[in-house]
UniProtKB/Swiss-Prot annotation:
The lineage of its organism: Bacteria, Pseudomonadati, Pseudomonadota, Gammaproteobacteria, Enterobacterales. This is Protein CbrA. GO terms for molecular function: FAD binding. InterPro entries: FAD-bd, FAD/NAD-bd_sf, Geranylgeranyl_reductase. Pfam families: FAD_binding_3. It comes from Escherichia coli O1:K1 / APEC. It comes from the Bacteria.
Length: 366
């Protein structure tokens, strides 16, 4: 039975970043259910927008995005729609439009060979015994059993590690549903849609590489029905759909209180969405995945006497920031307050009636 310093479960942005940063400094094994290459197998349903905080993480690490990860087009504003109030506003945002699956595979490709990575693998069982973490997983057609001094759960919303550490912990969850359509809009756009009759979270749309992606986060019980109802409503706002090319869904966490952030115990640690580190106001998680991976790297390499306590303290600033997102979310999903903010016109950038489209040139009006 092989023994490692660190076993990482999940290689999304958080797990991949941590594995890369610990390579050569600790003996690391990492398990991931995605394939190493291609589009077969699991892929994360996600709008695929890289927020400024995530961009800062790459600047800090000296990384640049390869062209095959970047999607087309790059858009500089978000069309915000309040369905009940029939209001639409445009707000400037500096997101990078990416192909999420290609991004995840690229992040994995950066992990040095010194890390033992198992792609297309399934973690079956974890337990703690004799001051070691035991992990049984299936990869390459057979089951393997390893031990590790430290266990890291980077396994997302349905984290097996979080459920093992905190079996009674309850956090609000939604089903995220999105569909892909052939792009029909003359001008591509991003949008953020609020309709409290449909969900107390929000919905979105993104133009990406010739497709129009429409999705949202809905109550688990009847999410599909609510999604369909919202699509029908959006025709009043000139949204064009047609026949769906692809449909996706997954569970997404929605932290709503301070206790929803859990960092681990007994030499087991949680990073990224597994720890509840996801914005309640935007459901953006990549930046917090990268930040929590960096914080845990620093703690593990310093080896303080009480690692879990040190990690909890080190994430305090991050948790406070995310708690601020909970407060912001409550403001955005309060119909009267949202309507007042949007009607005020604060930060709204009006679009010219005759702005150029892909079918007209900027000089056609001269």
């Amino acid at each position: 039975m092989e023994h490692f310093d660190v076993a990482i479960i999940g290689l999304g942005p958080a797990g991949s970043a941590l594995a890369r940063k610990l390579a050569g400094k600790m003996q690391v094994i990492a398990l991931d259910k995605k394939h190493q290459h291609g589009t077969e197998g699991f892929s994360k349903p996600c709008g695929g927008l890289l927020a400024p905080d995530a961009q800062r993480s790459f600047i800090r690490d000296g990384l640049t995005l390869p062209v095959d990860v970047i999607a087309n087009p790059q858009i500089f504003s978000v069309k915000t729609v309040d369905v009940a109030a029939s209001l639409t506003r445009n707000y400037q945002r500096s997101y990078i439009n990416i192909n999420r699956h290609a991004f995840d595979l690229w992040m994995k490709s950066l992990i040095p060979a010194s890390v033992e990575v198992y792609h297309d693998s399934l973690c079956r069982k974890i337990w703690r015994e004799d001051d070691k973490w035991h992990v049984i997983f299936r990869a390459d057609g057979w089951e393997q059993h390893i031990t590790a001094r430290y266990l890291v759960g980077a396994d997302g919303a349905n984290s097996m590690v979080r459920r093992h550490l905190y079996p009674d912990h309850q956090i609000r969850k939604y089903v995220a549903i999105q569909q892909w359509f052939a792009e029909k809009h003359p001008v591509p756009f991003y949008s953020c849609i609020f309709d409290n009759a449909i969900t107390d979270c929000y919905s979105w749309s993104i133009s990406k590489d010739g497709y129009f992606i429409f999705g949202g986060a809905y109550p688990m019980k009847d999410g599909q029905t609510r999604f369909t109802t919202l699509k029908e409503k959006m025709s009043a706002f000139q949204f064009q759909f047609g026949k769906a090319v692809k449909s996706e869904k997954c569970t997404v966490l929605f932290p709503s209180r301070w206790q929803d952030f859990v960092c681990g115990k007994d030499n087991a640690f949680l990073i990224g969405e597994a720890a509840g580190f996801i914005s309640a106001s935007s459901l953006e998680g990549i930046s917090y995945a990268l930040d929590s991976a960096e914080i845990l790297r620093s703690v593990l390499l310093k080896l303080p006497e009480k690692l879990n306590t040190a990690y909890w303290r080190a994430t305090r600033k991050l948790r406070l920031k995310l708690f601020g997102k909970i407060v912001k979310s409550r403001c955005l999903t309060a119909p009267a307050l949202r309507k007042w903010i949007m009607r005020s016109g604060v930060a709204h950038i009006p679009q010219l009636k005759d702005y150029p489209t892909r079918f007209t040139s900027p000089t056609s009006r001269m």
